[in-house]
Amino acid sequence: MIRSVVRGIGSALPKRVMKNTDFEGIIETSDEWIVQRTGIRERHIAGEGETTVSLGAAAARAAIENAGLQPSDIDLVLLATSTPNNTFPASAVAIQRELGITRGFAFDLQAVCSGFIYAITTADLYIRGGMARRVLVIGAETFSRILDWTDRTTCVLFGDGAGAIVLEAAEGHGLTSDRGILAANLRSDGNHKEKLYVDGGPSTTQTVGHLRMEGREVFKHAVGMITDVIEASFEATGLTAEDIDWFVPHQANKRIIDASAKKLHIAEEKVVITVDRHGNTSAASVPLALATAVADGRIKKGDLVLLEAMGGGFTWGAVLVRW
C-alpha cells in the first residue's frame, strides 16, 4: 500500500520578537498575567515586507532543501492559512511562483488553527489516490494583521510564522511500523462558529475585520474535542498513548496542552512545547513545533508522532505519523 512519508521539513519566523513586557505600554497587562494564563513569553510579529506568502515561501524552500529535492519535483503546493495575501488568487499560487514551480497545481485550505492538520490529511488523500507523488504542505499565518490591539484577551495570544513539510509517496506494508501517515481524523461543528471568528469579510462588511474570541468557551470545549478525535485515531490503528514517542499539539495555550496530555496519559517529557516562544501561530503552529523538535534532535526517524489541533468553526483533528 502507498504511505505518505515526511521527506523534509522547514520553518520561517519574522525578525521582530515581541515580548510580554512590550505590551505593558499598549494595554493593561503584565508578563506575569500572560504567562500564568497562557504560558506565552514572546512571539514573532511580521514587519514591513513580511507576509504570509514570503514566510510560507521561506519555510517551503527550507523543507525542499531538507528533503534533498528541487522545487520542480513538487506536484502539489497546499497552503493552510486564514490570513492570505489577497482574497484571490490563492496564496499557494503566489508561493508556487516564488519557488519557480510551473507544473502541478496549488491551492489554499482554510480551517484556521486546524489548517495544517486538515492540509496533511488532504495531501495524504491526493498521494494515496495517485494524483500527486510529492506534496508541499505549508502552514503560514500573519495573525498580527487581524488582531485588535486594544483587546488584551486576544492580542497577547498570537504570533506570526510558517512551517512546511514535503510528503512523498512510498511503498508500505499496511503495518503500524510503516513510516508515514498511519491515521488521520477530522471533525467540525458549525454550531460553535461565533465562539472564535473574524468580524469581517468581503461578502458581509467588505473589510478584513478583527479576531474575536470567547476564550472560556473555547477552553471548555477544547480538551474534550481534542482527546476524542485522538482516541479515534488510536482505535483505527490499534495503537495507544503508551506507543507515542512525541506529542506535538497545536500551540494555543499551555493549560490546554497540559490538560490534553494529562487526559490522554501522555508523559510531560513527551510533549513538544513552543507556545512560550511562538505564541499561537494558528495553522503554522504544529509545523513550527515539529520543525523545532526535529532540529534539536528530539524527533528521529522511526518515532511515532501524534499531531492535533483545534480551531475556529469549530474545526479539529488529529494525525498519527511514523517519522
UniProtKB/Swiss-Prot annotation:
Alphabetically sorted, this entry's keywords are: Acyltransferase, Cytoplasm, Fatty acid biosynthesis, Fatty acid metabolism, Lipid biosynthesis, Lipid metabolism, Multifunctional enzyme, Transferase
Annotated region ACP-binding: where? 251-255
Instruction: List its EC numbers.
Output: 2.3.1.180
Q: Which GO terms describe its cellular component?
A: cytoplasm
Q: Which InterPro entries match?
A: ACP_syn_III_C, ACP_syn_III_N, FabH, Thiolase-like
Q: In which pathway does it act?
A: Lipid metabolism; fatty acid biosynthesis
> Where does it primarily localize?
cytoplasm
Which Gene Ontology molecular function entries are recorded, alphabetically? 3-oxoacyl-[acyl-carrier-protein] synthase activity; beta-ketoacyl-acyl-carrier-protein synthase III activity
Cytoplasm as a keyword of this entry, yes or no, is: yes
Q: So where's the catalytic machinery, residue-wise?
A: C113, H250, N280
Question: Where is it localised?
Answer: Cytoplasm
**One GO term of the biological process aspect:** fatty acid biosynthetic process
The main enzyme category here is: transferase
Q: Known catalysed reaction(s)?
A: malonyl-[ACP] + acetyl-CoA + H(+) = 3-oxobutanoyl-[ACP] + CO2 + CoA
User: SUPFAM superfamilies, per this entry?
Assistant: Thiolase-like
Q: Does the keyword Cytoplasm apply?
A: yes
What does the comment on domains in this protein's record state? The last Arg residue of the ACP-binding site is essential for the weak association between ACP/AcpP and FabH.
Q: Which HAMAP family match?
A: FabH (MF_01815)
Q: Which PANTHER family match?
A: 3-OXOACYL-[ACYL-CARRIER-PROTEIN] SYNTHASE, BETA-KETOACYL-[ACYL-CARRIER-PROTEIN] SYNTHASE III, CHLOROPLASTIC
Q: Give the similarity note.
A: Belongs to the thiolase-like superfamily. FabH family.
Report the protein's function. Catalyzes the condensation reaction of fatty acid synthesis by the addition to an acyl acceptor of two carbons from malonyl-ACP. Catalyzes the first condensation reaction which initiates fatty acid synthesis and may therefore play a role in governing the total rate of fatty acid production. Possesses both acetoacetyl-ACP synthase and acetyl transacylase activities. Its substrate specificity determines the biosynthesis of branched-chain and/or straight-chain of fatty acids.
Q: How does it assemble?
A: Homodimer.
Q: What is this protein called?
A: Beta-ketoacyl-[acyl-carrier-protein] synthase III
